[in-house]
Amino acid sequence: VDSEAHLQPAARWVAHGAGEILDGVQTFATLEQALADVDFTVATTARSRARFHYYCTPPELLEQLSERKQWVGQAALVFGREDSGLTNEELALADLLTGVPMQADYPSLNLGQAVMVYCYQLASLMGVNAAPQEAAAPEGQLRALRHRADALLDALEVGDDQKLRDWLHQRLGALPQRDTAMLHTLLHDIEKKLAK
């Protein structure tokens, strides 16, 4: 996002045989543009933020993503800048937040270390699954649920309560697919009642 670091000669020196990754880089002006076609976004953070309360550890993230593997078409794991991480506005674009638990006064890994921890933890998701796959839920299901929930908050005239909206968005990101589908049904019923 808004970077040309992959074009620098030093990027090839440290890529160690992964030049095809650098060759396939897509760039975007903003994180929001980069996530436009992503169904489920996970953002990494080292700091506790007042607006965001639910975090999962890397093992918990593996569990969350494993459950979603059958119904999420495209997922993104977002890392922040080396020096300052992600902004609150960027974190707000995520469905789920994750962090590596650390015992230190300033709990932070450098970017390379954080990427290694998550690559190691999530490597099993890239394996070939020989088991028959369940029918996938429609892509964008979580995004549609968020829009419906936001519309309901507006209809109830509490849409300007940013704390409530942030909390709701974070909790929706943690729901398994079955609960997401059930909540769509519930919101549909509520919408019908409100329309009367």
Curated annotation (Swiss-Prot):
One of its GO terms (biological process) is tRNA nucleoside ribose methylation. One of its GO terms (cellular component) is cytosol. Pfam families: SpoU_methylase (PF00588). One of its GO terms (molecular function) is RNA binding. It comes from the Bacteria. InterPro entries: Alpha/beta_knot_MTases, RNA_MeTrfase_TrmJ/LasT, SpoU_MeTrfase, tRNA_m1G_MTases_N. Its EC number is 2.1.1.-. Keywords: Methyltransferase, S-adenosyl-L-methionine, Transferase. It is an enzyme of class 2 (transferase). The keyword Transport does not apply. S-adenosyl-L-methionine binds at T44, T45, A46, G80, V100, P107, S108, L109. PANTHER family: TRNA (CYTIDINE_URIDINE-2'-O-)-METHYLTRANSFERASE TRMJ, TRNA/RRNA METHYLTRANSFERASE. Belongs to the class IV-like SAM-binding methyltransferase superfamily. RNA methyltransferase TrmH family. NCBIfam families: PRK10433.1, rRNA_methyl_1. This is Uncharacterized tRNA/rRNA methyltransferase LasT. It comes from Serratia marcescens. The lineage of its organism: Bacteria, Pseudomonadati, Pseudomonadota, Gammaproteobacteria, Enterobacterales.
